Swiss-Prot record:
GO terms for biological process: cell morphogenesis; cell wall organization; lipid A biosynthetic process; peptidoglycan biosynthetic process; regulation of cell shape; UDP-N-acetylglucosamine biosynthetic process. Pathway: Nucleotide-sugar biosynthesis; UDP-N-acetyl-alpha-D-glucosamine biosynthesis; N-acetyl-alpha-D-glucosamine 1-phosphate from alpha-D-glucosamine 6-phosphate (route II): step 2/2; Nucleotide-sugar biosynthesis; UDP-N-acetyl-alpha-D-glucosamine biosynthesis; UDP-N-acetyl-alpha-D-glucosamine from N-acetyl-alpha-D-glucosamine 1-phosphate: step 1/1; Bacterial outer membrane biogenesis; LPS lipid A biosynthesis. This is Bifunctional protein GlmU. The active site is at 362 (proton acceptor). Its EC number is 2.7.7.23, 2.3.1.157. Homotrimer.
Amino acid sequence: MYNCAIILAAGKGKRMKSSMPKVVHKVCGKEMVNHVIDNVRKANIKDVNLVIGKGSETVKEHTKDRNVTYSMQEEQLGTGHAVICAEEFLKDKKGTVAIFTGDAPLITNETIQQLFEFHNSGKYAATLISSTVQDPTGYGRIIREASGEVKKIVEHKDCNEEELKVNEINSGMYCFDIEVLLNSLKNLNNDNSQGEYYLTDVIEITKKSGDKVGAIVVPYEEIMGVNSRVQLSEAEIVMRKRINHKHMVNGVTFIDCESTYIDVDVEIGNDTIIYPGCVIQGNTRIKEECTLYSNSRICNSVIGSGVIVENSVILESHVGEGTTVGPFAYIRPETKIGKSARIGDFVEIKKSTIGDNTKVSHLTYIGDAEVGSKCNFGCGTVVVNYDGQKKQKTIIGNNAFIGCNTNLISPVKVNDNTYIAAGSTITKEVPEGSLAIARSKQINKEGWLDKKGLLKK
């Protein structure tokens, strides 16, 4: 059986009050429309078509790696009109098409699979997704036959007294036999107060043709649409709970999961402990037995097993197993830190490689450098990597001891097994096995304060 999907992503999203199309706003690190696309893919649906309109180029840019096709809806004349705009996608296809909305990011791949299975096994012409809610005010009601089939969808304003008591509501997501849908679209009109073409009318047309219409009931959170920043926040809360629950089931400890923020594509190994206030973003991979103390942010990075991070920021970098980072360290993009290293408080590392067992304990800046293993950086060391025009490189070998308050003026090389005296400004290569001293000789002028009249008596 051939299955495909159409995702409606042309809405203007006026209530978002944004220059961006609504569907590219993110929920837990991923655009809403990409949540829908990815879950459709997980349900083994290969052919996906996006109906786009406002901000179409922006939507294309955010979905360009998703292998989807596009249909253009120049004017937004209703959901039915949006599907009409995708007729070319459906042309010459036979099978089943599901229709989803790009602003409902909480739909799961399990529900999508259930929708197709229910529709195809029951040989329905149309199947819709519904939900039961305590307060259905404002929603279209699902009215069923005694057999359980869907009889009709009635908009709230058109409900009679009995229909108002119904708490099963329409989600705006459907499954259709493609041939039935295309035939029904030919009979769709915009004879209503808004002058729009409604997809709900296709259900009525299908029913009048004598075809079966079914419905599956899912939790309300799965059909939640996002039309405002408030609803975006509500969707974020639901998604975050799902994400954190998944990690806890997989063996991750959260001290307070309500105040831990993890993007949907993050992977975390078992026996890792996460304290409140941590933010883990992008495609970060955290291995087992790590400890992330409060107020740490990690984005698009790989963290080895047994790493401890405390009150620090790690961006687009790799941290080797057994390393400790922080408190208050800043690991900038393109940094690779080896195993069992120590990156301490108020240390900033940018676009550098740090070897195994190297200690950079406090108040140090390292940029555009290659640092070997078992090195020690004293407090206040600065790699002076910028000459006013471009960044220069510093190379430090293994077992180098860098004294406190040292400036390494790039480009410069410090070879293996070297010492640099505290307070030095290094501008030339330091040979292997040597001690480098680059500071002025101390001069003591005895009696100077008394001569200047500065000595307090």
